Amino acid sequence: MIVISSHRALKDSPEVAKNQIRAHKSWQNVFDEILYFGDPEPELTCPKTSFITSEDFPPIAAMATAASMGGDFACLINADIVVSKGLIWAMGDVWKRGGMAATSKRYEFVDENLNDAQIVDVGIDFFGASYDLWAQVAKRVPPHYRVGHSSWDTWLMGFFNTVAPQQYWDITNRRCIYHPKHGDRKRAHHIKAIDDIYTLSCGFPMLRL
């Protein structure tokens, strides 16, 4: 299983560095390959890691194209998301049930305490899908959707609900996806969301593990 993300420069702030390094350490225990869009960072480097030089806020289409090339399940995850080993089993169960895609709400934690993490919003920082479904995303996602824009997840949820409604799973109950409580947010606010047939179908999957 592959993970694809876009990281911020660790020099941006100590908080950004801490959160992304913590996430990267958790990914090494779960994923076979780790692919970052952005300049190389020594502290995010391991034998599993590759970097693709990219502009800030890379297009979702570019990341989906990369996800489509692995011949396996690939996950798009925000760079500060900690994952548990349970994600391996959750995605395996999705596959066994004929699933093609999955998402999860995030459990917010403070300091290093994952045990007491709680769902505090409906933010989505994780999507997993088969490589062939990512290929469809790459062809259809509008070019204005980029990492850092709060509506790209709306589009992607709607797309999966539309093209794979019986193969799209909510794995929230498996408690695999953790998000650190933090400030210092950086968003591409200048991008205007434009509704289409997919954004109008946004919603969590009907199927749940």
Language-model features and meaning:
Residues 7-16, 36-76, 82-86:
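Active-site-proximal specificity loops/subdomain of glycosyltransferases
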Residues 31-40, 100-104:
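Short, hydrophobic beta-strand segments that form beta-sheet elements in well-ordered domains
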Residues 67, 81-158:
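Conserved catalytic core of nucleotide-sugar-dependent glycosyltransferases
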Residues 8-10, 40-43, 80-82, 107-109, ...:
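Short, solvent-exposed loop/turn segments at secondary-structure junctions
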Residues 31, 70-71, 98-99, 164:
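Short, well-ordered alpha-helix to beta-strand connector turns
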Residues 1-5, 27, 33-36:
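Hydrophobic targeting segments
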Residues 17-33:
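Short, acidic, metal-binding catalytic loop of nucleotide-sugar glycosyltransferases
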Residues 1-16, 23, 143-209:
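C-terminal catalytic/acceptor-binding lobe
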